[in-house]
Curated annotation (Swiss-Prot):
Name by which UniProt lists this protein: Ubiquitin carboxyl-terminal hydrolase 20
InterPro entries: DUSP-like_sf, Papain-like_cys_pep_sf, Pept_C19_DUSP, Peptidase_C19_UCH, Ub_carboxyl-term_hydrolase, USP_CS, USP_dom, Znf_RING/FYVE/PHD
Protein species of origin: Homo sapiens (Human)
Annotated GO CC locations: centrosome; cytoplasm; cytosol; endoplasmic reticulum; perinuclear region of cytoplasm
Subunit comment: Interacts with VHL, leading to its ubiquitination and subsequent degradation. Interacts with CCP110. Interacts with DIO2. Interacts with HIF1A. Interacts with ADRB2. Interacts with USP18.
Catalytic residues, chain numbering: C154, H643
Disordered: annotated span: 257-347, 360-415
Function summary: Deubiquitinating enzyme that plays a role in many cellular processes including autophagy, cellular antiviral response or membrane protein biogenesis. Attenuates TLR4-mediated NF-kappa-B signaling by cooperating with beta-arrestin-2/ARRB2 and inhibiting TRAF6 autoubiquitination. Promotes cellular antiviral responses by deconjugating 'Lys-33' and 'Lys-48'-linked ubiquitination of STING1 leading to its stabilization. Plays an essential role in autophagy induction by regulating the ULK1 stability through deubiquitination of ULK1.
Modification comment: Ubiquitinated via a VHL-dependent pathway for proteasomal degradation.
Gene: USP20
SMART domains associated with the record: DUSP (SM00695), ZnF_UBP (SM00290)
């Protein structure tokens, strides 16, 4: 990497080229075919003014270089240099670094040889968000692309437009396209990536047809098949769940990885060790127990002042282009589960007085098994407050008895607990999870949208307090009525918890007479100005209603584990971890047994400065608590029919636009404020994050020559460019637990990393912590050995099973038949066939066995089991252990008399201790 042999000897042939010259040429055309940009290439040979097209067209730039023997050329969009003679990307800094490298032979010898393919310093630009796009005035603004209605698909179009205008997600799909890899069908992430690229392309069409994504979502969830109108919130949940499933990656054990890197690192500065933030495996969160299972990066490259720098870090205003033509690489070939996890809760048995409880934040109880909300009682509608358990999140970890929370600024201290109670680890893992290694997953979806809620419930009889941490991806908020508002405001003014049932009782089951009265009242209300009926409902009121304390009494009493009976209780909930983008769903639709209706009440929501500080738990470590509105989805019509549109703020020019299927119209912000919001997307706002990016831009512009360059995760750099709180540097996305590159990632490692100069790396490392520091990439030999050993193990196990099962099938009358649980067998089969990386736990026949009155175990009637031979059972049991052993033994009894000449076949189930 730093070897002088890697230096391009042709850099001296570059003539004097100014930034203004390059910008002027970028507005021109190919001198051979007349095609316009982007991605024109300018020859850098002295006194050569040629500008040619790239591989996207006829590639006249290459033809010119080969004919004229002009070796160096620069991309007029990305300002990256390519040498045809060396067949690699080159950097102007190498001319400055050459004397230093030449005088440091010791360093050159120690440096590792370059990899088999050139690794690129990726141009990701960070510029001032306030800069105008004057250099691209001749181009239409990006992201203003409509979507054709495919037949009652406005619910999908509005949701996609709202997501498309979430910069962290869009920037990921535009700038980190190499990370969008999946072997899972229907590869919805690929369809979404293609759609985002079309919507945000500089030469965008007036509208696109999202056929591929529509077809994919119908394969995932049959509910969306046909042409019936659907709920946009259900579509959002289903889409994001599937994107997470396809993009999820196992979380590497950070502690082991840090130790592995530290053992090889030349920098052991104790100060840096103290500055490191808690790693990602210290997040405190768990799965939601929701029963609802399914539910900008826009590129601008030309105008950066760092046109000749090795590192251009893109900004959230979208001035960096997506890397479709990153370099002219003729040498390199591109060849080569958050599963349905068990619930993991944080429960605590705590004796505390009500007086002490009053001093604590209001936190709530875990939901009942059929509840879709951590803080509300079940309601007969189609809404869910928390995400489905099909999307696990960052798991619960404990170190020395203290639960730690990750924070964005570097900090390593354990979380500050509330004085009246202490969280303790609950033993609620299922039998399978105890026996099988727990695997944790994360994805860009969970990084952006996942938050967590701390729920607390107290028994009013014994004062037992239990806590649960649950992950949410959206908050479904009730819309309080006039009476509810009075109760909420009264509780606020008196500084006491709101009266329980503030928003639940008003929507209780209604009789026919009550229904008619309610229907007439709602019709009259909809025709009467809101000022006539009372105060306007605000989004803060909806949040207060959601987080208000609830009494558990009557039919909703709390089942106390200490009292062993139903008791009256109180439940609270607070936000434990704020998401980068907060999705809020207003519960406008009510679906009762005999009818449905829509709540048309106007809910006032802020465009800027939504503050969630009043709803945070004391343990919350999020430093930024204010949010600005990104987009809002609106529904016009009734509960039975209607139309969806979206209002979104364009990240480039800050203007608001209405997206109505294929029509996009600029609107004033007052139109947005008066809209009847249904789903709202808010983004964390931080001036400090913008200043931090500007500081990194300044450091990159200094172009200080250095002996070392560092590799950083491209995905984390995208977080730095678009997140208000990016968190610690997470190089674990391209490293294994041993500190090397996993063999299966090495062939596309340049898609996973970005090269940073030393001064930029040191600034980011000192500011955010994390890591580990990486300035040498190598394939992990330990992982390679493990992969080979795993493949050998799989081959031996499956070959042995096939051999034993073939012999078993050849037996006409086996003396004994062993039973094995098909659930366990399917897990083992997935492992040996390579569909699952984790081997199954011990054999678990408990699902197919039942105990007789005498204590013996027999096969359960109707059980899901398979029949195997004694030899096969012995072989599998020797590898995995477990049980119980269930054998159906066949024996022929002695004849009882002449009338029974053929004997009697007796079949009994036997159980042996394992």
């Amino acid at each position: 990497m730093g070897d002088s042999r890697d230096l391009c000897p042709h850099l001296d042939s570059i003539g004097e080229v100014t930034k203004e010259d390059l910008l002027l040429k970028s507005k021109g055309t190919c001198q051979s075919c007349g095609v316009t940009g982007p991605n024109l290439w300018a020859c850098l040979q002295v006194a050569c003014p040629y500008v040619g097209c790239g591989e996207s067209f006829a590639d006249h730039s290459t033809i010119h270089a080969q004919a004229k023997k002009h070796n160096l050329t620069v991309n007029l969009t990305t300002f990256r240099l390519w040498c045809y003679a060396c067949e690699k990307e080159v950097f102007l800094e190498q001319r400055l670094a050459a004397p230093l490298l030449g005088s440091s032979s010791k360093f050159s010898e120690q440096d590792s040889p370059p990899p088999s393919h050139p690794l690129k310093a990726v141009p990701i630009a960070v510029a001032d968000e306030g800069e105008s796009e004057s250099e691209d005035d001749d181009l239409k603004p990006r992201g203003l692309t409509g979507m054709k209605n495919l037949g009652n698909s406005c619910y999908m179009n509005a949701a996609l437009q709202a997501l498309s205008n979430c910069p962290p997600l869009t920037q990921f799909f535009l700038e980190c396209g190499g990370l969008v890899r999946t072997d899972k069908k229907p590869a919805l992430c690929k369809s979404y990536q293609k759609l985002v690229s079309e919507v945000w392309h500089k030469k965008r069409p007036s509208y696109v047809v999202p056929t591929s994504l529509s077809h994919g979502i119908k394969l995932v969830n049959p509910m969306f098949r046909g042409y019936a109108q659907q709920d946009t919130q259900e579509f959002l949940r289903c889409l994001m769940d599937q994107l997470h499933e396809e993009l999820k990656e196992p979380v590497v054990a950070t502690v082991a990885l840090t130790e592995a890197r530290d053992s090889d690192s030349s920098d052991t500065d104790e100060k840096r060790e103290g500055d490191r933030s808690p790693s990602e495996d210290e997040f405190l969160s768990c799965d939601s127990s929701s029963d609802r299972g399914e539910g900008d990066g826009q590129g601008r490259g030309g105008g950066s002042s760092q046109a000749e720098t090795e590192l251009l870090i893109p900004d959230e205003a979208g001035r960096a282009i997506s890397e479709k033509e990153r370099m002219k690489d003729r040498k390199f070939s591109w060849g080569q589960q958050r599963t349905n996890s068990e619930q993991v809760d944080e429960d605590a048995d705590v004796d505390t007085a009500m007086a002490a409880l009053d001093d604590q934040p209001a936190e709530a109880q875990p939901p009942s098994p059929r509840s879709s909300s951590p803080c509300r009682t079940p309601e007969p509608d189609n809404d869910a407050h928390l995400r489905s358990s099909s999307r696990p999140c960052s798991p619960v970890h404990h170190h020395e008895g203290h639960a730690k929370l990750s924070s964005s600024p570097p900090r390593a201290s354990p979380v500050r607990m509330a004085p009246s109670y202490v969280l303790k680890k609950a033993q609620v893992l299922s039998a399978g999870s105890r026996r099988r290694k727990e695997q944790r997953y994360r994805s860009v979806i969970s990084d952006i949208f996942d938050g967590s809620i701390l729920s607390l419930v107290q028994c009013l009889t014994c004062d037992r307090v239990s806590t649960t941490v649950e992950t949410f991806q959206d908050l479904s908020l009730p819309i309080p009525g006039k009476e509810d508002l009075a109760k909420l405001h009264s509780a606020i003014y008196q500084n006491v918890p709101a009266k329980p049932g503030a928003c639940g009782d008003s929507y209780a089951a209604q009789g026919w007479l009550a229904f008619i009265v309610e229907y007439i009242r709602r019709f009259v209300v909809s025709c009467t100005p809101s000022w006539f009926w009372g105060p306007v409902v605000t989004l803060e009121d909806c949040l207060a209603a959601f987080f208000a304390a609830d009494e558990l009494k009557g039919d909703n009493m709390y089942s106390c584990e200490r009292c062993k009976k139903l008791r009256n209780g109180v439940k609270y909930c607070k936000v434990l971890r704020l998401p980068e983008i907060l999705c809020i769903h207003l519960k406008r639709f009510r679906h009762e047994v005999m009818y449905s209706f829509k709540i048309n009440s106007h809910v006032s929501f802020p465009l800027e400065g939504l503050d969630l500080r009043p709803f945070l738990a004391k343990e919350c470590t999020s430093q930024i608590t204010t949010y600005d509105l990104l987009s809002v989805i609106c529904h016009h019509g009734t509960a039975g029919s209607g139309h969806y549109i979206a209002y979104c703020q364009n990240v480039i020019n800050g203007q608001w636009y209405e997206f109505d299927d294929q029509y996009v119209t600029e609107v004033h912000e007052t139109v947005v404020q008066n809209a009847e919001g249904y789903v709202l997307f808010y983004r964390k706002s931080s001036e400090e994050a913008m200043r931090e990016r500007q500081q990194v831009v300044s450091l990159a512009a200094m172009r200080e020559p250095s002996l070392l360059r560092f590799y950083v995760s491209r995905e984390w750099l995208n977080k730095f460019n678009t997140f208000a709180e990016p968190g610690p540097i997470t190089n674990q996305t391209f490293l294994c637990s041993h500190g090397g590159i996993p063999p299966h990632k090495y062939h596309y490692i340049d898609d996973l990393v970005v090269i940073l100069p030393q001064n930029v790396w040191e600034h980011l490392y000192n500011r955010f912590g994390g890591g580990p520091a990486v300035n040498h990439l190598y394939v992990c030999s330990i992982c390679q050995v493990e992969i080979e050993a795993l493949a050998k193990r799989r081959r031996i196990e499956i070959d042995t099973f096939i051999k034993l099962n073939k012999a078993f099938q050849a037996e006409e009358s086996p003396g004994v038949i062993y039973c094995i649980s098909m659930q366990w067998f399917r897990e083992w089969e997935a492992f040996v066939k390579g569909k699952d990386n984790e081997p199954p736990g011990p054999i678990d026949n408990s699902r197919i066995a039942q105990v007789k009155g005498s204590g013996h175990v027999q096969l359960k009637q109707g059980a899901d089991y398979g029949q195997i031979s004694e030899e096969t059972w012995t072989y599998l049991n020797s590898l995995y252990g477990g049980g119980p052993e269930i054998a159906i033994r066949q024996s022929v009894a002695q004849p009882l008399g002449p009338e029974n000449l053929h004997g009697e076949q007796k079949i009994e189930a036997e159980t042996r201790a394992v």
